[in-house]
A protein has these predicted regions:
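Active-site and adjacent substrate-binding regions of carbohydrate-active enzymes
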Residues: 1-207
């Protein structure tokens, strides 16, 4: 998909979670139906909800969950997902509750009535919640990766090379006018190394 975006000049906005659900219709053609169903079942087993298309059975169009809960509330998975989002082609967009590693809000769902399924990922954060969240490593680390991306000119019209030496290994190097960025990710262990170089100064993040 990253190669297709690059080669076809496809312009995208990249999101993990958003104010609505995590869309499923866009997965058709990218993943087999069996894999899509397995993803649905996994998210539901972790407390998420699934919405059918206009009430039709077995024709699902979104799952409702925070991205953090969909990943099993695993900090390493969340941070790798954020790194991949930031290094993929397109403009990254970050939903506030994902940044703060928010959990499924089933109480809000119960209060929301018929359309309450969307409230699972719309928890209101107080100033105290935000202050406490900014002390969490998962929040600070996401912010650090975002700052690395924002400060590096390689992502603005730069050249991307997609390297995949093995099914679970992905390398995404960017380069533009001396600015460089590189992500090396192991999808099986969730380990990754992100490096950006701008004006002779290098920033490195590893997990």
């Amino acid at each position: 998909w990253a190669k297709e975006e690059r080669d076809e000049g496809i312009r995208t906005v990249n999101m993990l979670g958003c104010h609505d659900g995590i869309p499923l219709l866009d997965l058709k053609g990218l993943l087999p139906m069996e894999r899509i169903q397995a993803l649905i079942d996994l998210v539901v087993s972790r407390g998420g909800l699934v919405k059918s298309l206009h009430g039709q059975k077995n024709l699902y169009y979104q799952v409702n969950a925070t991205y953090y809960s969909a990943l099993g509330e695993d900090d390493r998975k969340m941070l790798l997902a954020r790194a991949l989002q930031l290094f993929m082609p397109g403009k990254p967009q970050v939903w506030y509750l994902d940044l703060f590693a928010g959990r499924n809000d089933r109480e809000a769902v119960a209060r929301g009535g018929e359309a309450g399924h969307k409230e699972i990922n719309r928890t209101n954060l107080t100033g105290r919640d935000i202050a406490a969240g900014l002390e969490r490593p998962i929040v600070r680390d996401q912010l650090r990766l975002m700052r690395m991306r924002n400060a590096c000119g390689a992502f603005e019209g730069g050249t991307l090379t997609v390297e995949q030496a093995a099914p679970d290994r992905l390398i995404l190097p960017w380069e533009r006018d001396g600015s460089r960025a590189r992500l090396e990710a192991d999808l099986s262990t969730y380990a990754f190394r992100a490096v950006t170089s701008e004006g002779g100064e290098e920033s490195v993040f590893e997990q």
